[in-house]
């Protein structure tokens, strides 16, 4: 209670929190606004039947969108196009020397340029996905011309309902762009990472349905190991606790590199250098690799699923990339490891750290300053990142294993077993750290209470 009073006693922090929650509430309103021309009840019934059948791609998409996908609403695409666009732009930076040079010479201008490129790619990807979404809705007979704008939605050109396609593309693309704008506003003026908070909000919104699935499937009196009984429930709870602890451990874990400071002369006095350490995070990328890997696999799989009835090879691709399959699991693990290294390489700057240490007279015992320090930091970070990447992949892949062993619905295993839990816990910890830093600047005890010297009030 004392911490909450501290949080809300600071006017600026209180305004940031209120601003963040207000925009997140606006996101949830979009879940209840259907795409014009689509029968919402028929769509929900169809997806309920589909989602209850097996571990399907649409289950993961529905969790990411907070239930908007199954209801076919204006924000059904969620922020997946934005995340895919961010991946494309980050890869372009790596493979285009001109962008790298611009980022080094004018970081602010480079960031603005990357932001414009990300928005452009988001627009293009959202248009493509919403077009496929409209085609899928027509094929599944989920469109009822006459629900909204009866005259316009019934118009056809060469037998193709062009107005319906145009309406769906405009509405759903606008929904994605609105979510992107909200995420950027939260990151700039609120608390936490806006896009990550939107994803987390959608996942938390599916928690009641997860609990409902557990209790509907639970059969306490059954002795059949193939049914979901008390033993399966206890195993599920144990896995939930393990994933929770492992997530906190992997996100908060650091490798402490000892640092010694040289003697300095201040005025006429010689001050002895003290010892400290440089913390290298075990998982420097946080939950970014999980979000990137899930979104990247979701994009081609969604296209294959939408067009599977028109091509046998697309149907095979959709089946292979369906969550829970062996191919999906292999790609998922490899992508998590790749994006962990990729994000660490783009964000961790050993040459800058080595340069700052040399300027401040700091050194690592047994390692010369300058280039040797940079090489040592790169070597150490690569080893630490490997451990973090493998651990992250193991925790993230638990849902498919859990679903097969315990025979629970995919939404339960996704939420309690790995992917969703990693994202939710990681984003919550990151947001708490931002609030903690905000409080410490003003000499308050942080939200994440640790033993630390207190400043004067």
Curated annotation (Swiss-Prot):
Biological-process GO terms, alphabetical: intracellular protein transmembrane transport; protein targeting; protein transport by the Sec complex
Subcellular localization: Cell inner membrane
SUPFAM superfamilies found in the cross-reference section: Preprotein translocase SecY subunit
Membrane topology: Multi-pass membrane protein
Keyword Transport assigned: yes
Pfam families referenced in this protein's UniProt entry, alphabetically: SecY
Keyword Nucleotide-binding: no
InterPro entries: SecY (IPR026593), SecY/SEC61-alpha (IPR002208), SecY_CS (IPR030659), SecY_dom_sf (IPR023201)
Entry keywords, A to Z: Cell inner membrane, Cell membrane, Membrane, Protein transport, Translocation, Transmembrane, Transmembrane helix, Transport
Organism superkingdom: Bacteria
Annotated GO CC locations: plasma membrane
Transmembrane segments: 17-37, 75-95, 120-140, 163-183, 195-215, 230-250, 287-307, 326-346, 386-406, 412-432
First-listed, main subcellular location of the protein, grouped into a coarse class: membrane
Family annotation (HAMAP family): SecY (MF_01465)
Function noted in UniProt: The central subunit of the protein translocation channel SecYEG. Consists of two halves formed by TMs 1-5 and 6-10. These two domains form a lateral gate at the front which open onto the bilayer between TMs 2 and 7, and are clamped together by SecE at the back. The channel is closed by both a pore ring composed of hydrophobic SecY resides and a short helix (helix 2A) on the extracellular side of the membrane which forms a plug. The plug probably moves laterally to allow the channel to open. The ring and the pore may move independently.
Family: Belongs to the SecY/SEC61-alpha family.
Subunit note: Component of the Sec protein translocase complex. Heterotrimer consisting of SecY, SecE and SecG subunits. The heterotrimers can form oligomers, although 1 heterotrimer is thought to be able to translocate proteins. Interacts with the ribosome. Interacts with SecDF, and other proteins may be involved. Interacts with SecA.
Protein name: Protein translocase subunit SecY
Record organism: Chlamydia muridarum (strain MoPn / Nigg)
Protein encoded by which gene: secY
